Amino acid sequence: MDPSGPGFQRSWSMKSLIICVSTSHGNTRRVADRMAEVLDAEVVEPESVDPENLCQYDLVGFGSGIYYMSVDTRLRKLIRRLPHVDGIRAFTFLTSGAGQIPLLDYSKPVRNQLASKGFKVLGSFTCRGFDTVGPFGFIGGINRGRPNDHDLEHAAAFAARVRIRVAGSPAAS
């Protein structure tokens, strides 16, 4: 059965939330919106999240662009404020102009913080995004048109795999 198709949703329902910070060009929001289609999730900004209410969700996504080699301050602040939870499934997703630098796993600090709060982190998705920050602005930016359709389909496939993992877990029934 196609996990992104309507038959899957009818056979099992889960409550999902995607928390997203997307400031410069809307790169991360485009990824969040595509994942939300697959997960039937609401996409919100960190300021609109009541940390105490996250226990209502089966799955929570945390997404941000990478700004000067780190996730956005607003997402970091929200994660610090989160209470300890009992195994809520989570995932991370990031967009970056420079792409993933092999020795710098941008999602690792976020994954570790979420795990320390009791979240079960199921995976991370990253892709390139259009970037005009700093010196890139002088040359018209890098990765124009990213994330592109191919990137968004990869994001949807990632979300579908996460959805299957949540549906197959004992806590999901």
Can you describe what each PLM-predicted range is?
Residues 3-13:
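Short, Lys/Arg-enriched N-terminal segments with co-localized hydrophobic residues
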Residues 1-4, 145:
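Selective for proline/serine-rich intrinsically disordered segments
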Residues 46-49:
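Conserved SAM/SAH-binding loop
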Residues 9, 16-23, 29-30, 34-44, ...:
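FMN-binding flavodoxin-like domain, especially the glycine-rich phosphate-binding loop
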